[in-house]
Amino acid sequence: MATLMVQGCTSDAGKSTVVAALCRWFARRGYSVAPFKPQNMALNSAVTVDGGEIGRSTALQALACGVAPHSDMNPVLLKPQTDMGAQVIIRGKVLGNMQALDYHAYKNTASEAVLAAWQDLSSRFDVIIAEGAGSPAEINLRDNDIANMGFAERVDCPVIVVADIDRGGVFAHLTGTLDLLSESEQKRTLGFVINRFRGDLSLLQGGLDWLEERTGKPVFGVLPYLHGLTLDAEDAVDEQGAHDVGAFNVVVPLLPRMSNHNDFDPLRLHPQVNLQFVKMGEAWPSADLIILPGSKATRADLAFLRQQGWDKQIEKHLRYGGKVLGICGGFQMLGERIDDPEGLESDAGSSAGLGWLSMTTRLISGKQLRNVEGRFVAADTLIRGYEIHNGLTQGEALKHPMLVLEGRDDGAMSEDGRVMGCYLHGLFDVPDSCNTILEWAGLKSQRSVDYAVHREQQLDRLADMLEEHLDMTRLKQCMGS
């Protein structure tokens, strides 16, 4: 078994993309390969085959390997709820909420969970491609590090460092990062990968020669900027959508603790849809469909929505015949009240909902985590997705469910048919279900994208790019595989 770790000079340097590319490259050559991310901080997560929860990027990398996502692949997941606190998930299961200082003190215990997960994964796969988090050179985070070099040192695995040249300063990033590492960490660093290059490579060659001479480390490859690459994003929301004249306008309010924004990726690719995220202070655009997204702090995000005056805009939209869809936390907002007696998401208390569905929600411990499929009640079309929520919703509105999932009702639709919502994520991934929702909202003759097929094409594109631009023979030799 060989483990290679991909670290980055900065956040968003391309670590997740490079790991996905490596996973698909090894899988295509018959290796038994799996991704591993010791610690991740993200609001976008996926349900695993063993009933746990991991970061979305790691789940994508598992698909690149051709294996089902498993909790061992991301043993520590932190889901921010406030600027100072997060929900802590260990090996797929919720441990509880912690403030930053409390979690820092807990890291030694978390480190044991990371090591155990890596050992279990290593016993089942030939190759492990591990991914760091942020930068390994964050001086204030080096004590008890489990995300980057702390993990690499403990399991004695080699590391490659990725830098994004498109942002500028790539040589300062790489040399500065290496200089801030300890002697042993520098020794285990095999070399570098430069990501997102555009232009004539011959103009970069002098810099590459200087970098290799100064550091004594090879540049394994310069990866090109891939225009039009669309894969599941994990952190920042890609606010770009189609902007065709006469397109069907889908509007999503950008909430501070918005979660699982990957729900909207198929709409971003839809040739007839103009997907728009409305940010704080922006004018509310014309909309055919408004979608209230999932949230990791539903009551706080609902208060933010009201502070922006967006509730009035949505009410006006409904008054003029528009449609509103709520997903998970957004579904809870559509009801009359949200109760959080245990303070699971923020301070304990209750908040009035938007009141468009006759129902109330109580947040309870014991998160629901499942991959499910079923059918729309009104259209009898297939739906497939996943649930990640703490809410228990009750009320008259549930007598008119939106979905039937494996023999049980889910969601609700208003009597006038203009408002509906459910707990299910992934509503737009299957073309038939995407078409059903868009037709309900008023779009005829839909041409929805099969997102699973699209995702596979993008992963193959990454592996093809790696084949052409990365010296995999040399990298494999350095790995010892």
Swiss-Prot record:
InterPro entries in alphabetical order: Class_I_gatase-like, CobQ/CobB/MinD/ParA_Nub-bd_dom, CobQ_GATase1, CobQ_N, CobQ_synth, GATase_3, P-loop_NTPase
All copies of domain GATase cobBQ-type, residue ranges: 247-433
GO molecular function, one term: ABC-type vitamin B12 transporter activity
Active site feature: 328, 425
Protein's UniProt keywords contain Chloroplast: no
Matching Pfam families: CbiA (PF01656), GATase_3 (PF07685)
Superkingdom of the source species: Bacteria
Signal in keyword set: no
Classification via PROSITE patterns: GATASE_COBBQ (PS51274)
Keyword terms: Cobalamin biosynthesis, Glutamine amidotransferase
GO biological process: cobalamin biosynthetic process
The protein's annotated pathway: Cofactor biosynthesis; adenosylcobalamin biosynthesis
UniProt xrefs under HAMAP family: CobQ
Protein's job: Catalyzes amidations at positions B, D, E, and G on adenosylcobyrinic A,C-diamide. NH(2) groups are provided by glutamine, and one molecule of ATP is hydrogenolyzed for each amidation.
Family that this chain belongs to: Belongs to the CobB/CobQ family. CobQ subfamily.
Name recorded for this polypeptide: Cobyric acid synthase
Organism: Alcanivorax borkumensis (strain ATCC 700651 / DSM 11573 / NCIMB 13689 / SK2)
Taxonomic path: Bacteria, Pseudomonadati, Pseudomonadota, Gammaproteobacteria, Oceanospirillales
